[in-house]
Each structure stands twice: as C-alpha cells, then as structure tokens.
C-alpha cells in the first residue's frame, strides 16, 4: 500500500508537552463493559507540521484569498500562541508592523517574545487593511462584533480545516501543532534542545 505523501516518518521533539497517552478502557463487570470517554480518540502530543506542509497550507490560503486565515496561520507559527488572542497594538507600532514583539500569555501570565517573519508581516498588513482595523481592535475580531476576538473554538475549527485541506488526518493535529511546529523546525536545524525548551517556555 502506498504511503500518503504527507505522512512519511519525522523525528519528534525529545521531550513531552505534558500530555500523556490515552489509557486503555477497563471493564467494571463481565456483563457491562465500561466505555472510556477517550475510546476511539487520539490523545497525547499533536504532531508538528513539516516545512512542506506549512508551505502547502500557505499556498492554499493564498490562492483562496483567505486573508484573515493566512495572517492567523502565519502568526500562530511565528508566535507559538493562539493568534486569535492578539491585539493590533501587540503587532503594530507607529503604523509599522513590528519585526519582534512580546505579549503576555493569557493562560500562564508569562511574557512570550517572538519574531515576526517578513511573510507574516505582509499577510498581517494585507489583512489589517482589508478589515479596516484600528489600534485598539483585536487582530482577529469575532464576526459577532469587534469587541470580542475570534474564540478558541473557532480557531480550533479553522486549524482543522487547514489540516484537512492538505490531506492530513485531523485527529493527529490540532492547535498545539501550531505551537510545536516552529520549535520542531529549529530543533531539526540546530539540534539545540535548550533553545527549543526556552522557546516553548520550559524552564
């Protein structure tokens, strides 16, 4: 059987993200087997995207003119954060898109610094102009009103669409894949585990 073009083996980061593998379901009795909540689900670490998969998603979003999604995807890779929680002021200063910035993680309260690549800056510039966003707006506002940002549930759905769009199994990838992708690429290029740990906020 031919292997899927996107599913050839890849090295994993040599440390855990903290999520364990699913435990097998057990039975409470011979007549009434217990069905675990996680039966049939793939749990644990989500896979990082490979360079060609990142490229494939970018190309599809560009061709489809999905300006918001392209900016959101690029920033998710760069920042290793949920891009839906970014504000204009986090990214733009004095009318120019920053090359490097830092934001406070809502979940942990820790400050995360990251570089914004040229292709991300171009995507953000195009999206901000198209959406006519102001300094105090969310970078990716909810369609229900600019006072709210795109929800994490909506973001997860979009990630699923991007993954499915290039033929990858959605169950093996998720929003955490965005976080792990840049770290995985840096580790494969440098082999510097400590740098990757710091990049992901591990002390």
What positions do the PLM features span?
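Conserved catalytic core of the tyrosine transesterase superfamily
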Residues: 1-203
């Amino acid at each position: 059987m031919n292997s899927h073009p996107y599913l050839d083996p890849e090295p994993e980061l040599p440390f855990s993200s903290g999520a364990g593998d699913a435990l097998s379901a057990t039975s409470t009795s011979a007549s009434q087997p217990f069905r675990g909540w996680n039966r049939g689900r793939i749990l644990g670490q989500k896979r990082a995207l490979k360079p060609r998969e990142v490229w494939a998603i970018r190309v599809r979003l560009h061709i489809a003119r999905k300006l918001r999604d392209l900016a959101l995807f690029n920033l998710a890779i760069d920042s290793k954060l949920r891009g839906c929680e970014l504000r204009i002021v986090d990214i733009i200063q004095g009318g120019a898109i920053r090359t490097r910035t830092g934001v406070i993680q809502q979940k942990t309260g820790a400050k995360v610094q990251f570089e914004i690549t040229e292709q991300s800056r171009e995507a953000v510039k195009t999206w901000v102009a198209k959406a006519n966003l102001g300094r105090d707006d969310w970078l990716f506002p909810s369609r229900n009103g600019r006072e709210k940002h795109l929800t994490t549930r909506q973001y997860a759905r979009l990630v699923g669409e991007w993954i499915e769009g290039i033929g990858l199994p959605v169950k093996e990838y998720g929003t955490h894949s965005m976080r792990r992708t840049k770290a995985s690429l840096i580790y494969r290029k440098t082999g510097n585990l400590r740098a990757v740990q710091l990049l992901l906020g591990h002390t």
